[in-house]
Amino acid sequence: MTEPQREFTEDAFLGGQLRLRQPRSGHRAGHDAMLLAAATPAQSGDRVVDFGAGIGAAGLAVARRVAGIRLVLVEIDAALTDLARGNASANAIVAETIVLDVSAGAEAFATAGLAPDSADVVLMNPPFNDPARHRVSPDKAREIAHVATAATLENWIHAARRTLKSGGVLTLIWRADGLAEVLAALDRGFGSLAILPVHGEPTSPAIRVIIRAIKGGKAPTRLYAALMLNDEKAAPNKQVQEILAGKGVLLGVP
């Protein structure tokens, strides 16, 4: 007799350095989370806050690369937060988990232990599908994870600006056709931008942008050469494969 299909899967990331339990259906962690983590700088002792952490994939990937960070995983969905907590424990990573709507405001953040000017690094993969152009999923968790309201991006960036110390780093991944929205939101309080377009293949337009910004930064914006997920023959890009195996970084991360 065959075993009934399980509600969850356990998947290997970073070449097996990280094993994460996640729902079989709904929003699932994948390439975006690992690319975001690879572009996020951190040092031992830094307080690193992952907004919209889901099962914890991006934040835990940073913690696997940089030992000794003080990781905080923030997620609105209590069930996903439980998975994130379990994933941290299963991978022997110390992480604080908080059930919180990133758009909730300063008072809710302070109550949850996220005071203003308290983080060295914030990373985030906000819901980014335009509801006007995206068919809403009947899966509520998937809808929350993928579909943005008009104010989602601005609210999340405002929360990052409030939470970060002066000179703190924000790294985010967003859809490429929404680059103008990101730049407009970052124009208030952030600078020293580094921008990396991500393409599915060399002949196609970018599908994602990864952006790193510094709170109060004054340096000129840097536009990096595009990252191709696949080459002209649709074969996986070697650099991307190294990143997914936990052997590479992006945007000059040390």
What kind of region is each of these model predictions?
Residues 205-254:
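SAM/dcSAM-binding transferase cores
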Residues 2-43:
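Class I SAM-dependent transferase core
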Residues 25, 29, 149-206:
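Conserved Class I SAM-dependent methyltransferase catalytic core
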Residues 36, 156, 213:
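Residue-level signal for inorganic ion chemistry
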